[in-house]
Regions:
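Membrane-embedded alpha-helical bundles of multi-pass enzymes
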Residues: 1-200
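Soluble catalytic regions of membrane-associated enzymes that act on cell-envelope
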Residues: 196-323
Length: 323
């Protein structure tokens, strides 16, 4: 349970306060357990809890966008938590089988823990992929710059081995070796973050920049549905985005943006290349021309091959031309 709580409360959007030891309680449990069944149960419980904390928004998504009643949306969340991250269960199973079949010693068991965890996290499919490398960036720890060389997957694997180092220090806590391992880990962290800082300082100065105005209309989901189906709200939604964009352009003054971005499905009309003068699409093109600014917007498009509407993104040039 403790590992589930530590991972869940150390991942984005929380500060990574337990990132370097979040797996330690689960690994200690695995090391102490001789029963494969209990190893599996420990892994499942840990993944269930961190799913419940980190992916609680699944219930809201099912309710808001799936239009499910709250009891059913909560059931969807519980089902996701039960099966969403079985990589931890499979890692525990593999570790226990290898331990028993090969008769591994204590040191070998310890080294195997981050290896199987990293392998199964990498190769077991996840509905929402994530890894332990991203919190380095979220917390702006200098070491995140090293993702340029090892990737965030690499940072995630390194984080698992740092968990192993702290586990080893805990195992030897009554010996001088424990203090040495702990001190060595702290020194490595300082060196690693210094290397990240140096890598960041060594980045070349950008040779170009783009100024972007991002507009969020905060349109409710049901308003979008009604607008897209032509049941009302279109004038209000379009007017809201026009108004907010115009305000942003005025505030920008001389630092005019290179282009404006509207979010997914912001524009409440199907945009088709053969109907560019349709009521709202025509108004949109006129707005772009008058504002003299390029626009990237999410909207409903039309898949000509399948003859079906599709979620799409459109780019309008300053003269209102669809690119």
């Amino acid at each position: 349970m403790l590992t589930g709580l530590l991972i869940g409360t150390s991942y984005i959007p929380f500060p990574p306060w337990a990132l370097l030891f979040c797996h330690v309680p689960l690994w200690i449990f695995w090391l102490r357990e001789g029963s494969i069944r209990r190893v599996l149960w420990g892994g499942w419980l840990a993944q269930f809890l961190f799913c419940l904390i980190g992916f609680h928004w699944v219930a809201y998504t099912a309710h808001e966008f799936g239009q499910m009643p709250w009891p059913l949306a909560l059931l969807v969340l519980l089902l996701f938590c039960a099966f969403g991250h079985l990589y931890l269960v499979l890692a525990g199973l593999s570790w226990a089988i290898l331990r028993d079949r090969l008769g591994l010693g204590r040191t070998q068991q310890l080294l195997l823990l981050p290896v199987v965890t990293a392998i199964f996290h990498r190769y077991v499919p996840l509905i929402f992929p994530w890894n332990l490398g991203y919190p380095w960036l979220w917390a702006r720890l200098p070491a995140f710059q090293l993702a340029e060389f090892v990737g965030f997957d690499g940072l995630g694997v390194l984080t698992l081995f740092l968990n192993l180092a702290l586990l080893a220090a805990w195992e030897r806590r009554k010996e001088r070796a424990g203090a040495l391992i702990l001190g060595g880990t702290a020194a490595f962290l300082l060196l690693f973050n210094w290397a990240g800082w140096a890598a960041g300082r060594g980045q070349p100065v950008p040779d170009a920049e783009a100024r972007v105005l991002v507009v969020q209309g905060n349109v409710g989901n049901f308003e979008k549905i009604y607008a897209e189906k032509g049941l009302g709200f279109r004038d209000d939604v379009v007017g809201r985005y026009f108004r907010l964009t115009a305000q942003g352009l005025r505030r920008a003054g001389e630092r005019a943006p290179d282009f404006v971005v509207w979010p997914e499905t912001a524009f409440p009309e199907v945009i088709r290349a053969d109907r560019m003068d349709a009521e709202y699409t025509g108004a949109l093109r006129s707005f772009v021309r008058i504002g003299n600014v390029a626009l990237v917007t999410g909207a409903i498009g039309h898949d000509e091959a399948k003859r079906k509407p599709t979620n799409a993104m459109f780019f309008f040039d300053r003269d209102g031309t669809l690119r």
